[in-house]
Amino acid sequence: AADTNKDQTYFLCQVSPAALHKTLFPLGKLTKPEVREIAAKLNLESVATKKDSTGICFIGERNFRQFLSNYLPSQDGNIVDVDTGKVVGRHVGVLYYTIGQRKGLNIDHEKGPWFVIGKDVQKNVLFVCHHTHKEWLYSDSCLVKGINWIVKDKNEIPEKCTCKFRYRQPDQDIYLKVLDDTTALVSYPQKIASVTIGQEAVFYDGFKCIGGGVIEEVYVDGKILSTYQERING
């Protein structure tokens, strides 16, 4: 997109090449101010004066946690400090929290901020770390599955490229090791915080999106990052 801040390739990475071949993006070369200017000239006031949308488009301005509660049952449980194994608070349902989240945790903040580093959905436990131990957030590689490659020839997939692990996050330098048609091991020379299982990892060759898939597992120093108990025990 002409406006990189509004680029939607992160969300479109799973559109098949066949579908993309038949798809037009008439606004791709225009910025939002330019679109509004055109709309004003055509007397399309509702478009020209419409405010920027915020939040998730399909739920509008509603509270996201409240929206989820209408469809997904939740149960409160313990928040555990991964460094000590001690319970430091109570959560309202692990599905309402995301990796790297700092705000909205029911923990004594007099000891400084805490960060969500993981979840045990089966045991209904939310793992956190104190801000002085943020190394728990960092990984050096991840396994990505269900990749949709947007290239004519898979031999064109570069070994070295960039990846976006979250929307509007700066692109990160990575190395791709393609394991099969839809799976790749992604490693990064500099450790990255909050790479999250279930999120999309979207690959770029320069400004061109070449594909993306779902993060299946995250690693650090050859160990699965989510095996917190194993890391506590050394």
Question: What do the predicted segments below correspond to?
Answer:
Residues 224-234:
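Acidic, low-complexity intrinsically disordered tails
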